[in-house]
A protein has these predicted regions:
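Hydrophobic residues on short alpha-helical segments
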Residues: 183-191
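Short helix-capping/hinge SLiMs at alpha-helix to coil transitions
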Residues: 37, 191-196
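Charged alpha-helical initiation segments
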Residues: 1-39, 154-170
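Residue-level detector of well-ordered alpha-helical segments, enriched
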Residues: 39-43, 98, 131, 182
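Long, charged low-complexity segments
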Residues: 2-10, 27-29, 66-141
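Hydrophobic alpha-helical packing segments in soluble, helical-rich domains
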Residues: 40-62
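Short acidic, hydrophobic short linear motifs in intrinsically disordered regions
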Residues: 186, 195-205
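Long, low-complexity, charged/polar intrinsically disordered regions in eukaryotic proteins
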Residues: 110-184
Length: 205
């Protein structure tokens, strides 16, 4: 799924932004599944910064260099002031406002500053992960260069909840419960594959 997303986005966006987007998204997912909630929030912030730059490219044809401070408040205001019809509402309103909340969780909660004595928790991390999933789905819809059916399959697999007992090791799916028999392993693997399914050879291997 990631390779399809990568190839599609790179046809419309700078490669370094696509790489940053996918790296931070993947890290956020992995940290969430491992219950590393503090890194999850921080990576959610990095993900938001990558998407803010993608919005800059779409709206203005240029973007704030990676490593340079983003003026997110000004950017959000500028995007919402783009005349109706010149950009989609997702670019103007929905994605920026979602990123603002992700960014606030990252910068104003315990994950970034440790100022209010509140430990990061699963509630914050679950919100960040769901918001990142939604934003990724929107980006696929906006920038995909595949068929409509392929794009829909990609979106559905992005937002689909994955099983913690199945991990992907270099393209090889492995179930982590040693007490399971072949039937349980087969069912779990098929659930993890989602709507794309799996071939008989893939299941045997």
């Amino acid at each position: 799924m990631f390779e399809v997303v990568k190839q599609g986005l790179e046809q419309k966006l700078p490669k370094e932004l696509v790489a940053e987007l996918l790296e931070t998204y993947s890290e956020t997912k992995n940290n969430y599944y491992l219950s590393k909630f503090r890194p999850n929030e921080v990576e959610g912030g990095r993900f938001a910064e990558a998407v803010f730059r993608i919005l800059e490219v779409q709206a203005y044809g240029t973007y704030t260099p990676l490593g340079k401070q983003l003026g997110t408040e000004k950017l959000i205001t500028n995007l919402q002031n783009i005349p109706f019809g010149k950009q989609s509402d997702s670019i103007r309103l929905h994605i920026p406002r979602t990123l603002r909340v992700i960014y606030d969780v990252r910068t104003k909660r315990d994950a970034a500053h440790l100022t209010d004595g509140i430990d990061p928790n699963s509630q914050d991390a679950t919100f960040v992960m769901a918001a990142c999933d939604w934003v990724m789905a929107e980006l696929v819809r906006l920038f995909h260069s595949v068929s409509p059916q392929e794009a829909q399959n990609i979106v559905e697999n992005i937002v689909e909840r994955k099983l913690l007992v199945v991990q992907n090791f270099g393209g090889f799916l492995k179930t982590l419960n040693p007490s399971w028999g072949p039937k349980e392993r087969l069912i779990a693997t098929l659930c993890q594959c989602g709507k794309n399914g799996a071939t008989v050879d893939e299941l045997i291997s």
